[in-house]
Swiss-Prot record:
Residues 45-56, 104-120 have a biased composition (Basic and acidic residues). Residues 1-12, 23-34, 93-103, 347-357 have a biased composition (Low complexity). It catalyses: L-seryl-[protein] + ATP = O-phospho-L-seryl-[protein] + ADP + H(+); L-threonyl-[protein] + ATP = O-phospho-L-threonyl-[protein] + ADP + H(+). Its main location: nucleus. GO terms for biological process: chromosome segregation; intracellular signal transduction. GO terms for molecular function: ATP binding; protein serine kinase activity; protein serine/threonine kinase activity. Residues 72-85 have a biased composition (Gly residues). Its EC number is 2.7.11.1. Residues 450-728 form the Protein kinase domain. ATP binds at residues 456-464, 479. Its cofactor is Mg(2+). It comes from Danio rerio. This is Serine/threonine-protein kinase tousled-like 1-B. Belongs to the protein kinase superfamily. Ser/Thr protein kinase family.
C-alpha cells in the first residue's frame, strides 16, 4: 500500500522531464544542454520531492544509485533484446524537448503503473485486466530489479548510457536536479564528464589546420604590410580629398567672383545700350523734325465730320517745283522766239531774195503816207534775216533748249532722290509715332534676357523690336504678339494656336538662307513673343520701292538664293511649302541687292506630311489667305472640293519676284488691289506672261520666267527641277556677242568673290 501511495504521489509530478530529453545526438560546440537550462529548478524540485518520500522509498532509490555502475554493462544487453521494453525505450527516446512538462498519452510503463492498474482492475471488472499493456503483473509489490528493466541501449550512446534512474519515470518526475548535482561522487556524473570531454576534443580537432608558425608569421606580416599600404592609400586619398575640397572652394569663390563680375558687366552693358539707344532715338527725332521742314509732314484735314491725314511737301520739293516751272517758262519762251524766227527765215529761192535799199525806202514811205488807202494801221513786216543771222539765232535757241532739258533731267533726278528720302522720312515718322504709343518704349528687359532697344516696325497685331540678348551677347529681333482684349476666347485660342504652329515649323529650320528662330515665350495671357535672327538691312520690297528695279545679275543672284532655300525646305521631312513668298518676306542682309538674302515669315506655311500630302498634292484649307499677286491660278479655283497645292506654289512666286526685280512691276494685276484681283479673276486669266520692251532682259531669263509662270501646274517646274535649271547653274557665262548662255570652264575665282 505504501508503494501505491508513493507511486500516486510520484505520478502527480507531471511537469518533470521525460527520458526522451536526454536522447539527442552529439552536442555541437556552443550548444546549451537542456539539463543546464533546467538544472536549478529541477534541483530544487527534486530535493523537496526526496524529503517528501517515505523511508522505504528512499532506501529503494539509494539501492538504485549504488547499482548504477553494474547497470551500465547490463544496459547494453537489455537494449539489444527485443520486446516491449525495447519498444518503450525507443518511444521514450523519440520524444523531443518540446514535450517537456506535458503528460503524454504514450507515457512509458513502470512496475508501479502495472501494479497500480492491476490493483484498480481488481476493484472494477475482470475484463479490464486484459487491457493492461505488456502482460499482467502478480499481486505482490514491485521488485528492485523491475526498475532496471527499462535500461536499454548498448552503452555506446551518451543518451542510452545514462543511468537507469534518469530513464525511470518515477525518478524522472522526482529528483532530476539531484542527479545533475552529483557530479563528483556518482559514476553517472563521471560518464557525463567523459562524454563532454570527448565532444570538446572532437570540436577542437575540427578547427585544427596545417599552418605552421612561420606561415602564420608570414601571413601576419603580409597582412600588416597590406594594412600599412591601405592606411597609406587612405592617407593619400584623404590628402587628395582635402586638396580637391580646397580647390573646389577656391573654384567656387572664383566662380562667385566671375558671376559678380558678369553681373556687373551685364549691368554696364545694359546701361551703355540704353544710353546709346536713347541718343539714337533723340537724334532720329531731331533729324525727323528737320526733315519735316525740308521733306514735308502730315497735317490733319477735316472733311465734314471726319478727319484725315494729308501730306504736305517741304521746301525742298517746293524749290524743285519752282525750278521746274521756271524751266517750263523758259522752254515756252524759246519756242515762241523760234516761231518768230521762223517767220524771218530767209527764202531759199532767188526771187525771194532780200529787197534792195530803194525798195525798202519806198515801202516805208507808203506805210507812213497811208498808201493803198488802208484805213487800218498795219504792223510793219518783220525784217527778213540773212541766212547767217537765221542760223545763228537757230543755234542759240537749240543750245538753250538743250540746257533746259539737262536742267530738267537734273531736277527730275533730284526729285526722285527726294522721293526716296521722303519715303524713308514718312516711314520714320510712322515708326516714331508707333514707338511713342507703344507700352514697351522704355527699354524693358523681357524674360530677364532680352533688352528692347527701339521699334523696327508694327503690324496689325504685332510689334517688332530690335533687342539685345544679354545671355548670348548678340542682337535679336523680338516680335511681340498682342491680342485684342475684346476678342472672344475662341479667337484668341485660334491666333495663339496659329502662332505656336508657326513657331514649331520655324524652330526646326536651320539654313543660311532662312532667318533663324531663337526663342519663344509668353508675357501674359494676351501677349507672347518670338525671338528671331536680326538683319541690319531692309527687305526686298522696300528696296524695289526705292530703286524700282535692278540689274539681271543682281536679280539672278537673289533668285538663286531663294531657290536654294526652297530646296532645303523640300528636302527635310516633312517638307514645307512657304506659300507666302513675296519681296516683303525676303530680307536683304546688307540692304543691297548684291548681298545675301534670308527668307522669313512662315505664318502661312504648309506641312506636307504623309497624312495630308498625296500624289496630286495637299488640300488648300486656307483659301483666300496670302498675297494674291504672288499666288498661282490653282489657289483661286473654287469648287466643291478644296484645290490641291504642292511646292509649285512657291515656284510661281519665284517667277513673279524675278519678273518684278527685272522690270520694276508685277506681271499680273500691277496697279490693282487684292479685292480687284479677286473680283476680276485676274490671276485666273493670266494664261501667258507678257514682257515689256524695256528694260532689256536676256532670252534665257525670259525662258526661266516662263517655266516658273506656266499656267497649268502640270507644265510648271517643281522646286527640285528649278534647282537644277541651266539658267541658275553657277558655271554658265553670258556671251557678249550672241546674248546666249555658253558653258565655259570654271576658273578659280579669288577668295571672297562669288562667280556666276
Amino acid at each position: 500500500m505504501s508503494v501505491q501511495s508513493n507511486s500516486n504521489s510520484s505520478g502527480s509530478l507531471d511537469g518533470a522531464p521525460s527520458c526522451s530529453q536526454f536522447s539527442t545526438g552529439s552536442p555541437t560546440p556552443g550548444s546549451v544542454s537542456p539539463l543546464d537550462i533546467f538544472a536549478p529548478r529541477r534541483h530544487k524540485e527534486g530535493m523537496d520531492e526526496l524529503h517528501s518520500l517515505d523511508p522505504r522509498r528512499q532506501e529503494l532509490l539509494e539501492a538504485r544509485f549504488i547499482g548504477a555502475v553494474s547497470g551500465n554493462t547490463g544496459g547494453s544487453t537489455g537494449s539489444a533484446s527485443g520486446g516491449p521494453k525495447g519498444l518503450n525505450n525507443n518511444e521514450c527516446s523519440s520524444h523531443s524537448f518540446g514535450s517537456l512538462g506535458s503528460s503524454s498519452d504514450k507515457e512509458s510503463e513502470t512496475p508501479e503503473k502495472k501494479h497500480f492498474e492491476s490493483s484498480r482492475g481488481r476493484k472494477r471488472k475482470v475484463d479490464n485486466q486484459s487491457e493492461s499493456s505488456q502482460g499482467k503483473s502478480s499481486g505482490r509489490g514491485p521488485k528492485i530489479s523491475d526498475y532496471f528493466d527499462f535500461q536499454g541501449g548498448n552503452g555506446s550512446s551518451p543518451v542510452r548510457g545514462l543511468p537507469s534512474v534518469l530513464r525511470s519515470p518515477q525518478n524522472s518526475h522526482s529528483a532530476p536536479g539531484a542527479i545533475v548535482r552529483q557530479n563528483s561522487s556518482s559514476p553517472t556524473s563521471l560518464c557525463f564528464m567523459d562524454h563532454t570531454m570527448n565532444l570538446k576534443q572532437l570540436s577542437s580537432r575540427s578547427v585544427q589546420t596545417d599552418l605552421t608558425l612561420l606561415k602564420l608569421a608570414a601571413l601576419e606580416s603580409n597582412k600588416n604590410l597590406d594594412l600599412e599600404k591601405k592606411e597609406g592609400r587612405i592617407d593619400d586619398l584623404l590628402r587628395a580629398n582635402c586638396d580637391l575640397r580646397r580647390q573646389i572652394d577656391e573654384q567656387q569663390k572664383l566662380l562667385e567672383r566671375f558671376k559678380e563680375r558678369l553681373n556687373k558687366c551685364t549691368t554696364m552693358s545694359k546701361k551703355l545700350l540704353i544710353e546709346k539707344s536713347t541718343q539714337e532715338k533723340q537724334s532720329c527725332r531731331e533729324k525727323s523734325m528737320q526733315d519735316r521742314l525740308r521733306l514735308g509732314h502730315f497735317t490733319t484735314v477735316r472733311h465734314g465730320a471726319s478727319y484725315s491725314e494729308q501730306w504736305t511737301d517741304g521746301y525742298a520739293f517746293q524749290n524743285l517745283v519752282k525750278q521746274q516751272e521756271w524751266i517750263n517758262q523758259q522752254r515756252e519762251e524759246i519756242e515762241r522766239q523760234r516761231k518768230l524766227l521762223a517767220k524771218r527765215k530767209p527764202s531759199s529761192t532767188p526771187s525771194s531774195q532780200s529787197p534792195t535799199p530803194n525798195e525798202s525806202k519806198q515801202r516805208k514811205t507808203k506805210a507812213v503816207n497811208g498808201a493803198d488807202n488802208d484805213p487800218f494801221l498795219k504792223p510793219s513786216l518783220p525784217t527778213l534775216l540773212t541766212v547767217a543771222e537765221y542760223h545763228e539765232q537757230e543755234e542759240i535757241f537749240k543750245l538753250r533748249l538743250g540746257h533746259l532739258k539737262k536742267e530738267e533731267a537734273e531736277i527730275q533726278a533730284e526729285l526722285e532722290r527726294l522721293e526716296r528720302v521722303r519715303n524713308l522720312h514718312i516711314r520714320e515718322l510712322k515708326r516714331i509715332n508707333n514707338e511713342d504709343s507703344s507700352q514697351f518704349k522704355d527699354h524693358p528687359t523681357l524674360n530677364e534676357r532680352y533688352l528692347l532697344l527701339h521699334l523696327l516696325g508694327r503690324g496689325g497685331f504685332s510689334e517688332v523690336y530690335k533687342a539685345f540678348d544679354l545671355f548670348e551677347q548678340r542682337y535679336a529681333a523680338v516680335k511681340i504678339h498682342q491680342l485684342n482684349k475684346n476678342w472672344r476666347e475662341e479667337k484668341k485660342e485660334n491666333y495663339h494656336k496659329h502662332a505656336c504652329r508657326e513657331y514649331r515649323i520655324h524652330k526646326q529650320l536651320d539654313h543660311p538662307r532662312i532667318v533663324k528662330l531663337y526663342d519663344y515665350f509668353s508675357l501674359d495671357t494676351d501677349t507672347f513673343c518670338t525671338v528671331l535672327e536680326f538683319c541690319e538691312g531692309n527687305d526686298l520690297d522696300f528696296y524695289l520701292k526705292q530703286h524700282k528695279l535692278m540689274s539681271e545679275k543682281e536679280a539672278r543672284s537673289i533668285v538663286m538664293q531663294i531657290v536654294n532655300a526652297l530646296r532645303y525646305l523640300n528636302e527635310i521631312k516633312p517638307s514645307i511649302i512657304h506659300y507666302d513668298l513675296k519681296p516683303g518676306n525676303i530680307l536683304l542682309v546688307d540692304g543691297t541687292a548684291c548681298g545675301e538674302i534670308k527668307i522669313t515669315d512662315f505664318g502661312l506655311s504648309k506641312i506636307m506630311d504623309d497624312d495630308s500630302y498625296g500624289v496630286d498634292g495637299m488640300d488648300l484649307t486656307s483659301q483666300g489667305a496670302g498675297t494674291y499677286w504672288y499666288l498661282p491660278p490653282e489657289c483661286f479655283v473654287v469648287g466643291k472640293e478644296p484645290p490641291k497645292i504642292s511646292n509649285k506654289v512657291d515656284v510661281w512666286s519665284v517667277g513673279v519676284i524675278f519678273f518684278q526685280c527685272l522690270y520694276g512691276r508685277k506681271p499680273f494685276g500691277h496697279n490693282q488691289s487684292q479685292q480687284d484681283i479677286l473680283q476680276e479673276n485676274t490671276i485666273l486669266k493670266a494664261t501667258e506672261v507678257q514682257f515689256p520692251a524695256k528694260p532689256v532682259a536676256s532670252n534665257e531669263a525670259k525662258a526661266f520666267i516662263r517655266r516658273c509662270l506656266a499656267y497649268r501646274k502640270e507644265d510648271r517646274s517643281d522646286v527640285h527641277q528649278l534647282g537644277s535649271d541651266s539658267y541658275l547653274l553657277p558655271h554658265m557665262r553670258r556671251s557678249n556677242s550672241s546674248g546666249n548662255l555658253q558653258a565655259t570652264p570654271a576658273s578659280p575665282a579669288p577668295s571672297g568673290i562669288i562667280s556666276y
